[in-house]
Amino acid sequence: MSIEIVPHAAAHVGAVAAFNSRLAAGGSPWSFYTDPLPDWIAPRPGQAVWREYHVAVDDAGDVRGAYALKPQTWLVHGEPRTVADWQGPFSEGSVDAKFTTLGLRMLRDMLKKYPLLYSWGHGGNEQPVVQMLLKMGWVMHQTPFCLLVLRPSRFLRLNALLRSSLLRRLALDLGAYSGVGFVLLKLHHAALRLRHACRFTATATEVPAFGPWADELWHRCKARYAAIAARDAASMNALVPAMGWPAGIRLKVDRRGQCIGWAVVLDTQMQGDARFGTLRVGSVVDCLADPDDTGEVVAVATQFLRRRGVDIVISNQAHPAWVRGFAQSGYAVLPNKRMFAPSPALRALLEPFDETARGLHLTNMDGHGPMAL
């Protein structure tokens, strides 16, 4: 049986639907996009970021695998490069041993299309895809997760991830209803804020789109990052559209009459989420500022979400200055919660890697975007 990897098109819609049905029947939790045109950042002429779908089709016309790519202009050491995130690969090999090697073939096909490939996510080194990447010579760069609990009692009672056993549920309920958990969490975040003892004076304004002010900020601060995806106004308006997903709230941050940064935040009421249960989750999914001004942006974004009544605020960050900015607002910084996995070619471009990694800016908007938020 021969298999060809081709761009997803209208002719493959039925075959993708059948592929998804076979995966579901085999017990796989995965599926692929039946619509060949991405809902989010569809390809458009002149756009610096887009998504594209590819399918693995056998000689009978059946789809046996698929993957998505998100190419985007990055600045690496000041030079523009096309760097791509990948989603998948999704293979029938997860339910049928005849296609076990198809996932590796699709990954190699991605690398042929975009050698500067990366993945931003993963839960741990034990995952099969991580083991495969390590064997192929990829590097796993660990990055932290930032968490601020604003409503401790609801956090203790509704956070699904922490309530994984009867004993844990009893302990968390006791902490919530006795008030002990409320006091301890409030004291913990207060102590983290006091450790930095910072005063911030910036203000935030909700705006409907990114304008010339965003371009001016981008050109002013882009050289302060060793590696960063393009965050000019056009790119950000494509990533955070006026309608559709993600429903980002754009905050322009000013200090003494000058724009010093911006943040994109989400306010999401979860329902049956595996991690957050039914919490109301605020998230800082993207942000930009001079590294010296990160604390100002985080502070006003946090205040904005606090006023909206969210239970917690979360963010994934890679750049040490942004991690410090979240810590200055009392966030708990939990290490080694998300991995940046650059291909060997991208890793070579990022050399000296350890030094460049300290200037790498990644947020939830990078990679697949703020999925599940």
Identify the meaning behind each predicted range.
Residues 3-89, 123-124, 202-287:
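A conserved beta-strand-loop-helix scaffold within acyl/acetyltransferase catalytic domains
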Residues 67, 87-90, 103-111, 130-134, ...:
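Short, well-ordered alpha-helical packing segments
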